[in-house]
C-alpha cells in the first residue's frame, strides 16, 4: 500500500551532518512546515557516525573532529544540541595537532613537508627556487595542481618534492589533478626555516602563504579567527550524532533511515512529488514544497533522468579502516593524527583518539585507526584478506616508530568496504560542472543543492555548512 502525505513538505535528501544541521535551520525558518530527512543508510551522520563492535568497544571512521564555521548561527547549534559541559573544546594551537611521516621521520611538530630533512645542497636549491618565485606575480587561475605548486614554490620544489607524493597518493599524472588536491592534506606550505628566522619572515604575507612555522604548539598568535574544534567528552562522534537526531525529533523533524528515493515528479519547473521506499514503512508519496539535496550531483542527475553517459568519472583511492587497540599509549607525543607521504607505505593517516578524547583510553585499551590506501603499494582492497590488512597496519606502525616491543595488540577489526577518497582530478571536476549546468538548465525553482562539491572546492564541513545556511536564507 502506498502512503501519501497531504501537506507539502520540505524534504532533505541525506542525513549526514549537512542534512541534519540544515534541518534545524529550516525548522527555525519554517516553524509550521513538515520537514522530512531521509537517507539510505541504516544510521544517520554519514562518516560522522561511529562503528560499534560491542557495548564497550567503539571507533570513529578515522579522524573526525568538528571544526567551527566561525558563523554564530551555525556554531551555536552544536551547544544547543549538546551542552558545553559534554564537549571537549580546543582552540588556538591545540585546535588541530597534526603530524607527518616524511623522509623516514615522524614530524610531531608540523604536518607540512619539512624540507630541512634534505641535504644542505638541496636546501640551498629549494631556498633559491622559492625566493625566485616571490618576484613573480601569483597565478590567478592555475591549470592544475602542478601549475599552482610551481607558482607557489618554483619548479625545483614542486617537481622534486610534490610531484612524486601526489602521484603516489592518487595514481595519476599530477598534471591531471585539480588545484583542490593540495587542500586535502595541506600541501600549500612547506617548512624550510627554524623558528627564530620564521618569526621575521612571517611579517611578509607572501612568505606566510608559502612557509609553515616549524613548531605548531608554539605558533605565535597570528590567526584571523577564533575557530574552535569540538569533540564529545564521551568517546565516539556518534554520541553527538545521536543527540542531534533526538533533537530533530523533539522539534518535529521526521528522520527516515534505510530509505531510498524511487521517483521525482516534476511539473512546470517545480518538483511536485517524490516517492520514497522505506524499509520500515514501505512506499510513500510526498508532496514537496522544497527539496534540499545533499548527496551529490551524480545521484541527483540520475533521479532527474538526465543522461550523463557521455561523462567520465575517475574513482578515487580505496580506503580500508583498520581499527586497533594496544595495551599502552602510542608513541605520538601530542599528535591527534599524522599523514604518511613516504614510498613503500599503504598508510594514508593514523589517528590517535585518546590524544583529543582522553575517555577513549579505558581499561588499558588505547585505540587508534590506520587508514590504508592499498593503491599506494599497488594493491586493491578486494584482494586483501582481513589478517593481511591487520598485519600491514601493525607493521607500518612499527616502521613509523609509533609502537615498540612492549606494545601488545589487544583488539583489531577491519572495515574494507566503506568508502573511497574523492579523486580531485580535472576530469571529475569538469564532469561535475557539466552535471551542475544540466541540472541548472532545468530551472527547478524549489530545488536547492548543498553538501560536498555542491560548488567548486566545497569539501570541509565548515565551508559546506556556511554555503548551505547561506542558501537556506535565500529560499
Question: What kind of feature is each model-predicted range?
Answer:
Residues 18, 43, 298:
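Conserved Rossmann-like nucleotide-cofactor binding loop
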Residues 55-137, 187, 191:
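Dinucleotide-binding Rossmann-like beta1-alpha1 core, especially the glycine-rich loop
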Residues 27-53:
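Glycine-rich FAD pyrophosphate-binding loop
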Residues 29, 233, 259-383, 387, ...:
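Mid-domain catalytic core of redox enzymes
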Residues 2, 8-37:
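N-terminal Rossmann-like FAD-binding beta1-loop-alpha1 element of flavoenzymes
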Residues 127-262:
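Active-site/ligand-binding neighborhood in enzyme catalytic cores
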Residues 89, 93-94, 257-259, 265:
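Short loop/edge segments at beta-strand edges and connector loops
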Residues 2-3, 50-52, 109-111, 117, ...:
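Conserved flavin/dinucleotide-binding core of flavoenzymes
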